[in-house]
From Swiss-Prot:
Residues 67-76 have a biased composition (Basic residues). Keywords: Exonuclease, Hydrolase, Nuclease, Nucleus. It is found in: Nucleus. Residues 277-426 form the Exonuclease domain. SUPFAM superfamilies: Ribonuclease H-like. One of its GO terms (molecular function) is nucleic acid binding. Residues 527-540 have a biased composition (Acidic residues). Residues 1-19, 517-526 have a biased composition (Polar residues). This is Uncharacterized exonuclease C637.09. The keyword Nucleus applies.
Length: 631
């Protein structure tokens, strides 16, 4: 029997004609509100079947339907925006029973642009028409400015006020037109700390698939790990402000400053089987700043090969014994000077030598010695919060070596003990591989995650103060350095034309609100000082009010300049941190003095009462805000 006959008979045996099949599908789909799609599908199928009156095979029909769905979906995403397909956010006051987390904001971005899950707290209409997301960190705004104050355990405090109902600051009329609600948003942290709101947004959790891939690569790399794998890069030298060796300057002719010495040799290739020397120095304060008072060098056999006290060139003003372990008595008869140490280093350290240490940049700067092959344990191990925070050597020794160091208290540190700890930390790292001792390994840059999207990778950019490319913007397609908020606006608008995801940060409100200022914790009783303080506070209020007005204009300009189909999301990161910072300064001062002074000699006290106040201040600081809209 011919293929045509076979198909027709099979269709009759099933008791289903082509028209019956179409009608059945139409009814089924129409029940879900898609009558228009079914009508087009019916017409297309009728035309396809008019040539031979025979239904295609099931496989070919599925392929055809799949292709048509993809074409229609693509055509729909390319439609011009109108009232019917315009993307928008839909919510009610009762949607929120607790504050959002910054990770919730991140998931909203992934849902709109990539492979995220639908959020439960907001409905995104026509999300296929959203083509980019612009995120701004805007510290300096507080919940109380928008008519509410979130309180944990009280769900009514999270109801969302409408900004247009006289809840927003009078300086923000345009802002309140662009955004209709303020969303209470809680920063990550614990009882005593507020974690970085920058990392919270720009780092994304790894999927299980990515974790398996990472673990497989880690196991493979561990068996081939060697010390040279952990040499610092040129970029790390710059970022950590290491003194640069002439050969590191990429061919540029460099003259060593007076008094400085560089290691000699051919450094065009890394050492294959290097001699590794751990070095640690103790310093004292002199009339000309910090100077070397002791130098210790330990080899990889854990043997001390050099340990000398050094006579400072300038008069000592503070032996800082509680940190350095140096006393006047220890330096009294010392004749070794810095140039003697430099001569030893130049003789001992060559092109096959790697210098090892913890935050070795400070040691080398005091030694006035440069060398291009460096391993820094502060870089090859992570702080628990991840980069850019650096771990202390004491914490690394406790965590990974199960060893207590620097516990002499008032007697200070021991440079030999610190150098030995660095040796053991490197041995442990080489044994276990590059991923050992790193935190945030279950996270990746949001820019990496977006770039893996299929079928079209999404590209991200960043605009921030300073040099974002050296830190938070390393993984971004493009990073723009800005000097003020106006430059941030210009950069974000420009970047949004060619990028799917743009992150930026405003700083003016934060400065005007004194969020990042060091507050004086002491109260003065002088009446003239009180009058002066009142005047300063009035100036600060005026300055903040003016900053709000400029912020309002920038948001209007930014919103008007963005392309249609843009998700614009602002978050403050935290609430007001001033009280927390003030108490934390007292807390740190107490900890510092408690190590070396008697109780009645302490300049500050830290009791249970201060501790509870501090915990409460941290809690309040974690209460931030976010604002979102779609243009």
């Amino acid at each position: 029997m011919s293929k045509m006959g076979s198909s027709s008979m099979g269709e009759l045996q099933d008791g289903i004609t082509q028209e019956d099949s179409i009608e059945k599908k139409s009814k089924n789909v129409a029940s879900h509100g898609e009558k228009r799609k079914v009508k087009r599908k019916k017409e297309d199928l009728s035309m396809d079947g008019s040539n031979d009156g025979v239904k295609d095979s099931p496989d070919s029909n599925d392929d055809s339907q799949s292709k048509k769905k993809k074409k229609k979906k693509l055509k729909k995403s390319q439609q011009p925006l109108n009232e019917e397909n315009y993307p928008r956010l839909q919510t009610t006051e009762n949607n929120l029973q607790k504050p959002l987390k910054i990770s919730d904001l991140q998931e909203l971005v992934f849902w709109c642009l990539a492979d995220g899950q639908a959020p439960s707290w907001v409905l995104v209409r026509n999300k296929q028409m959203i083509h980019r997301a612009v995120i701004l960190l805007v510290p300096g705004l507080e919940p109380s400015q928008f008519g509410f104050q979130p309180v944990r355990g009280n769900k009514h405090s999270f109801l969302l006020p409408n900004l247009l109902n006289e809840n927003g600051p009078i300086q923000l009329p345009d802002f309140c037109e662009v955004f209709d609600r303020a969303w209470p948003t809680r920063s990550p942290g614990d009882r005593f700390r507020v974690f970085s709101p920058v990392n919270a947004f720009l780092q994304s959790p790894l999927s299980n698939e990515q974790k398996k891939k990472r673990d497989k690569e880690t196991r493979a790399m561990a068996s081939f790990s060697k010390p040279s794998d952990y040499l610092m890069s040129y970029e790390s030298f710059i970022e950590d402000e290491y003194p640069l060796h002439p050969t590191v300057m990429k061919g540029e002719e460099v003259t060593q400053p007076s008094g400085w010495v560089a290691s000699a040799g051919d450094f065009h290739s890394p050492p294959i089987n290097p001699k590794i020397l751990a070095i640690d120095c103790e310093m004292v304060r002199t009339e000309n700043g910090l100077e070397i008072a002791r130098v210790t060098i330990v080899d990889m056999k854990s043997e001390v090969i050099y340990d000398e006290f050094v006579k400072p060139e300038s008069p000592v003003t503070d032996y800082v014994t509680q940190y350095s372990g140096i006393t006047e008595e220890k330096l009294r008869n010392v004749t070794t000077v810095l140039s003697d140490v430099q001569s030893y280093l130049k003789k001992t350290v060559d092109n096959n030598t790697v210098l090892l240490g913890h935050s070795l940049n400070s040691d080398l700067n005091c030694l006035k010695f440069t060398h291009p092959h460096i391993i820094d344990t502060a870089n090859i191990y992570n702080h628990t919060r991840g980069p850019p925070s650096k771990p202390s050597l004491k914490w690394l020794a406790t965590k990974w070596l199960r060893r207590e160091i620097q516990k002499a208290g008032a007697l200070g540190h021991d440079s030999a003990e610190d150098a030995l700890a660095c040796v053991d930390l490197l041995k442990l790292k080489v044994k276990n591989g590059p991923a050992f001792g790193l935190f945030n390994q279950d996270f990746e840059s949001i820019f990496h995650r977006l770039s893996r999207q299929q079928p079209t990778p999404l590209i991200g950019a960043i605009a921030d103060y300073g040099n974002p490319e050296s830190c938070i913007g390393k993984a971004a397609h493009k990073s723009v350095s800005c000097a003020n908020d106006d430059e941030v606006v210009s950069a974000v608008v420009s970047l949004s034309d060619m990028h799917n995801f743009v992150w930026g940060r405003f700083r003016e409100l934060e400065h005007a609100a004194m969020w990042n200022a060091n507050r004086n914790t002491k109260q003065e009783n002088n009446s003239d000082t009180d009058t002066e303080n009142d005047s300063v506070e009035e100036d600060q209020v005026t300055s903040y009010s003016s900053a709000l007005e400029r912020f309002n204009r920038r948001i209007r300009l930014l919103y008007d300049s963005l392309p249609k189909g843009s998700l614009l999301l602002l978050y403050t990161g935290t609430g007001n941190p001033i009280e927390m910072s003030k108490l934390n300064a007292i807390r740190q001062q107490f900890r510092k003095e408690y190590q070396t002074k008697k109780w009645d000699e302490l300049s500050v006290k830290w009791t249970d009462e201060e501790n509870m106040k501090y915990i409460s201040a941290v809690e309040n600081t974690r209460n931030g805000l976010s604002f979102m809209t779609i243009k």
